Amino acid sequence: MKHQGVAMVISAIFALLTAFPAIASAGKILRYTDHEPYGNMRTQFIKNVFFSEIEKESQGRLKIGAHWKGDISSSYNALSTLGQGTRADIGIIVPEYTAEQLLLHQIFKSFPLGPANGEAQVRFFHRVFQQYPQFARELGQNNLVNLQFFLGYPVGFFTRQPDVKLKQLEGTKWRTASFWHQSFLRNAGGATLVMPWNDKITDALRTGQLNGLMVNLDSGDDIHAQRAAPYIHYSPALWLGHVYLLVINKDTLNALDERDRLAIRRAAETTEKQLGAALDSGLASLTTRLENEGAKLHLLSRDEQLEWQKATRYQEVQEEWVRQQESKGNTDAGKLMHELRLLLEANARQKR
């Protein structure tokens, strides 16, 4: 009986030890939502770099259950979905799609020109989010905390005809989504048409209903706009100001162990160091492919960029927007607009 008891104890200990790796490996799964399908520059970078670093830094305690292509939430519902935290813990939000809730985040896109390469763009956003707590506060009001920002491609002007002068768009019809960019095009002489985002925009370009499309390069490529409007003006400095925020539900973050919160922070730091180079490499690959497929790309000179900026009368547009916000009691809008303008102007002077 004594030997039998010892054997039972040994068996129990062995079972516990063999089960321990499985228990440890289970970890905490954070449900991730993204409105875009997996496979483009941003989604691959997030999965292969940020998510991998989170698992590595947490020693496997944290794992990501990724859902792409709006499987959990569309881009327009992501803010509320993540704020509630019942269906997803972390995910991408695009401030432009929730302008009322993320009012101050709209400021970025109001600048026609910005940093001229990926590294400079990353430095700019890092500084802004570190220096101005108003942005974190705005997210906090929606029960969210930003883990890491990601950026997209610059603006491309897809046109049916060659040699379009961006400073003189009289008699031309354009499609663009941003209310800022609509004002810019109208100030440069163009007319803007409202159309839902789908392949019918390419058809409208082909038939002449539209003369041009102003959109980030990869989105234009998604609907094959270059097949109907093969002449593309672009520059890395034609700054879309389109920031993707990878956020976490505040309650979810607070429920994590301190060591796991620190692991996520280290993963974000590593990711950010690689982001600028990834942006530049992705842009180079995309433009090369577009050219190989027959598109005629024109890299705008600095003088052409400044001509476009002047034609937009962007400061007038900004001032009108600030007046509207201040009339609603949003007193931070004007101050932040001024501060970001100074930062971008200082960046431009450094590049001269």
Q: In which residue ranges do the predicted regions lie?
A:
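Positively charged n-region of N-terminal signal peptides that target proteins for export
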Residues: 1-5, 9
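Hydrophobic, aromatic-enriched, well-ordered structural segments
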Residues: 4, 22-23
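Bacterial N-terminal signal peptides
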Residues: 9-21
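N-terminal secretory/targeting leader peptides
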Residues: 25-122, 135, 139-140, 144-352
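Intrinsically disordered, low-complexity, polar/charged regulatory segments
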Residues: 129-130
